[in-house]
């Protein structure tokens, strides 16, 4: 009776991780986080004006998402801070390769 290696499930795990990641990205990018204005028949999420005989709605576009974003300048956006912090962490982790036994850098 020959010995056989166990089945390799890495392809399955990679496909499952990609599927879950794709579903999460699609769900996050397709949901609306804008404030809902109007009633069940008249929805004005991007601003606008609606008038009929008994009611009038004037709603202007949302200006900013939160108090973290002070303006429309690129250097005041929170995503820039995230990118800079990730780059700083990645660059600070690049140090000389140390020998795991003696904890010194050897020349090649």
From Swiss-Prot:
Residues 1-8, 94-108 are cytoplasmic. Keywords: Host endoplasmic reticulum, Host membrane, Membrane, Transmembrane, Transmembrane helix, Transport, Viral movement protein. Residues 30-72 are lumenal. It is found in: Host endoplasmic reticulum membrane. InterPro entries: Plant_vir_prot. GO terms for cellular component: host cell endoplasmic reticulum membrane; membrane. The keyword Heme does not apply. Its main location: host cell. The chain crosses the membrane at residues 9-29, 73-93. One of its GO terms (biological process) is transport of virus in host, cell to cell. TGBp1, TGBp2 and TGBp3 seem to act together for cell-to-cell propagation. TGBp1 is the main movement protein that physically cross the plasmodesma with the viral genome. TGBp2 and TGBp3 would facilitate TGBp1 function. Plays a role in viral cell-to-cell propagation, by facilitating genome transport to neighboring plant cells through plasmosdesmata,. Belongs to the Tymovirales TGBp2 protein family. This is Movement protein TGB2.
